[in-house]
Amino acid sequence: SSGEEKMYLYRDFELSSCVLRIIPYVGIDYEHYCMKGVKAILHGTYHSSTMAVTPYKDDESKRYTSQAILSLKKRCDECEPPIPLFLEHCHRDAYNYISTGIILKCGAIPVWTMTSEMTYVKLLVGCALGYEGEELKEFMNREINDEFVYRD
């Protein structure tokens, strides 16, 4: 345990399919994903916490290619309320990688302390408890029941 006071989940809540989990693959097209009913997105990374961020279809249009995670982040930001985009398993030094650094600087939220499965379940619970925005981010970064298995 992290030594912090434990958080107990005594409130009733109902899990729903409001977290979209995306596992990256070569040729992914983010236009194929529907955002209806989505409260949070959990996006995996390639090895070493890297991802495809090829920014533009062409330099003149400044439109993101639909195969770049930046296009997904833009869609998330345009939703009301904005949909938080969590990246997992995202190493603490991921800012050192150009590709991952770009998406993190654009506001994606790194998760590196938990397994993929635990991160997904915790996001489901956080959304079911009604957390959004900063509150959801704080919930994800607070250890509740020894779920943080990766440490410095």
Please give the residue ranges for each predicted region.
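C-terminal non-catalytic interaction/assembly regions of soluble proteins
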Residues: 48-152
